[in-house]
Every structure is written in structure tokens, then in C-alpha cells.
UniProtKB/Swiss-Prot annotation:
Keywords: Capsid protein, Membrane, Transmembrane, Transmembrane helix, Virion. Its main location: virion. Pfam families: VP1_VP3. One of its GO terms (molecular function) is structural molecule activity. InterPro entries: VP1_VP3 (IPR009379). It comes from Sulfolobus spindle-shape virus 1 (SSV1). It comes from the Viruses. GO terms for cellular component: membrane; viral capsid; virion membrane. It is found in: Virion membrane. The chain crosses the membrane at residues 8-28, 65-85. It is a multi-pass membrane protein. This is Structural protein VP3. Belongs to the fuselloviridae capsid protein VP1/VP3 family. The lineage of its organism: Viruses, Viruses incertae sedis, Fuselloviridae, Alphafusellovirus.
Amino acid sequence: MEISLKPIIFLVVFIIVGIALFGPINSVVNNVTTSGTYTTIVSGTVTTSSFVSNPQYVGSNNATIVALVPLFYILVLIIVPAVVAYKLYKEE
């Protein structure tokens, strides 16, 4: 009943790095799937509203696909450790 240390270290590092990178990935996806923002400026009695477009917007057709990236990322974070853990379990 010998437990290999390399796969366990790999799992721990994989999960920690994966969790650490989820925030930035989600932030970038939100940035490229947002077409722009509305800005309202109030000066005295005059209110001006304008739309500021996002130059990094990927378009409405691609935004649907790009919005799925965090979901697939989470699936990889779940499936890879599960497969490695299953292989470790079957070796014993």
C-alpha cells in the first residue's frame, strides 16, 4: 500500500492555481462580453447621459460562446482532479 507523492502534489498545485486563476479569467470574460456602459453627468440642472462603448467587446454572436469559458474552466477544475484521484484509487 504505497502512495505516490507526485500525483498528490500535482492535485494540490493544480487546484490552488486553478482557483487563483478563476477570478482573473472571469473578470476578462465579463470585460469582453460587456458592450459598454452608460455614463450620466449631472452639472447643475443639466443632466447628460452618454454610452461609452467597450473597444474589447467581442460582439453579440461571440459573447455567448465566450461567456461559457468560466463554466468549462470549472468543469476542468472538477474533472481533472477526479480522474487523477480515481487512477490513484485504482492503483491500490
